[in-house]
Amino acid sequence: MTSFLPVNNTSSPQTRPMEEVATAATPRPHTNVSATEENRSRTMNSGTEDATPLNLHKVQEDSASRTKPSLGHNGTSHGESDADRDGSDHDSDAAGNAPPSKKKKGQRFYCTDFPPCNLSFTRSEHLARHIRKHTGERPFQCHCSRRFSRLDNLRQHAQTVHVNEEIPGDSLAATGTRFQRQIRTDRVRPQGRARAGTGGSQGTHSRGHSRNLSTSSIASTTSTYSQPPELRRRPPPLIMANDGSARTRLGLDTMADIPTTPPGQVRGIPGPAVAVGSPYTPSHRLFAAGGNGSPHLASARPAAAHMSGFWDGKTAARRLSVPTSANPFASQQPNNYPPSLVGSATPTTAAYPPGGVFASPVSSTHSFSREENAYSAADADLRRRTWHPSTHFALPRPATSGLSHYQTPDTVDAPVNASGATEQPPRLPGIESFDKVVLHQRPLTPPVRRPSPMQIDSHRKPSPSYALGGGFNYSQPANRPAPPISGPGHRRGHVSWDMSLHTNLTGLHIRDKPLPRDASHWSQQTIAELQNVSSRPSSSYQQQVQESRGITGHSAYEKMQGWYGGHTSGSQATRTSPEDSSSSEGVHTPSTASLEYHPAIVHNSGYIESHPPSMACDTSHSACPPLSQFSDGYQPHVKPDPRPDFYHNASVRDSGMGRLEALVAVATSENKNTAKLYG
């Protein structure tokens, strides 16, 4: 070291020999061997410099200052990131301890092999690295087969990517990272890594090397994993400082050994790291060895460590503190959880590792180290129970996980949701099923309508007067609900009724023509009904005509009878007509079906019911009471006054003509023409 001090203090010529020696150590051919030698020589130099620095800080500063001047110069002259990083590493080590101007001139190493590049470096090692960039050479290979042009990059890679993995002993990454780190942990820093360590202790530089250092590693999770021993020492205070003060204290006070998180991380690390003496190692051994039963512990643990940094314990502590209020639910939770979760939620000491991992990824993993440190197995169990329930109760997360039923605010809702989960699907399906019911049951509706028209007719006895008084009798709609007495038909009646109301209000043509909707929905029925109509067209149609006419001019009783007969066949006939004519018009079928159910309601006068049976009937019905009001739209309906005459005449004399006309009207769905024929 003393020899270095004079060199640092002396002018550049002496320093050159030093540098040249380093260069000799690493010839510029830049072979893989040379590269490794170069790095090793660098580390050796740094190691020699730093070996004493632990004890002699000034000496270290001096040695750093030796590099420092070059670094200062490097910072100004170096355009390359690598050189800058290296220089910055050393510069930061001795940040301005020595004036950079002294050694700049003598120590410069220039990149002359590649003409465009004229970068200068204070150390031959840096130049060698730089040249590897030009050549693209990557002599340092990781056991994962990735290659790097710089050893420090390889080490960083190993520290980050292979933190929790076993690195083969022959791997450069292993020698560069863990071996040296363990030595460093023991305060032995023979190699260049030690220099970075001293710099790290100074905290001046953030280089990759410094990251590797235990001191800087405190700030970096990656290094934390790689350096479990030191982390155990240092992290506790850091964790305390980082913890949300009282909140973490609640969970961590009993656990003065907050470093539990580092132990958790250490678990992920191979045995030697765990083996390093620490108050936590015993528990770790339990979980590492006894916990070996749960292979996922190690893997899961590292994952948790990555997620939470080395604050796993802290996170758990928070949850413990927060959930304490939820402890009363602890008993509920095990019951509430699915059996698998219950086991994990209330694990035995042996079950802790797996239980923690599965029950709540964050808290469970953290709880291990904590309880291991400060609690007996029984206490740990109790705390875990309260803690798990508390997390589920206090935190909304369980809701997503399906544990929401057990959350305090959700406990009431949870059962509702549970049943609701079953009920809700039925609700939606209920709506859909309702439509399905309408579709499927509509074929059944015509029979239901038959009695309903009777009732409506009975109610209609006064209705004609109402119709005379006002075109739209909504009192009849009130009567209309009676027809839907059939369960499904009832709601359908309402739906169809609403549809019919809209259609009636919007278009007068509805009376003139059966709504095309009827045809579409009743297409199937219509086919059968058409056949029925063809088989018995005369009787049904005449009855319908008589029915409509009877309503117009005859007593309510006759009208009811005519209705009944007419409606039964008429509805079929009507369907037939919509089917024939409105197959294209089928879109309107729903309303027509509703008309068939409650024609009176659909039509203001309430004749909609008569309307669906047959369009002719609708025509006549609309003509009957509402005729006065709807005479404009229903001129053909006005003729129903003579129709009452035809009622007898048509039934008696024109039965044959009525049959033909009814068939024609049904096929063409031309109600006006049919009405005119009878008129």
From Swiss-Prot:
Gene ablation phenotype (knockout): Results in increased resistance to the chitin synthesis inhibitor nikkomycin Z and causes increased damage to pulmonary epithelial cells and vascular endothelial cells, as well as increased pulmonary epithelial cell cytokine gene expression.
An example Gene Ontology molecular-function term: RNA polymerase II cis-regulatory region sequence-specific DNA binding
Residue ranges with Basic and acidic residues bias: 79-93
C2H2-type zinc finger segments: 109-134, 140-162
GO biological process, one term: symbiont-mediated suppression of host inflammatory response
Protein role: Transcription factor that seems to function as negative regulators of virulence by affecting the capacity to damage host cells and to stimulate a pro-inflammatory response.
Record protein name field: C2H2 finger domain transcription factor dvrA
Organism (species): Aspergillus fumigatus (strain ATCC MYA-4609 / CBS 101355 / FGSC A1100 / Af293)
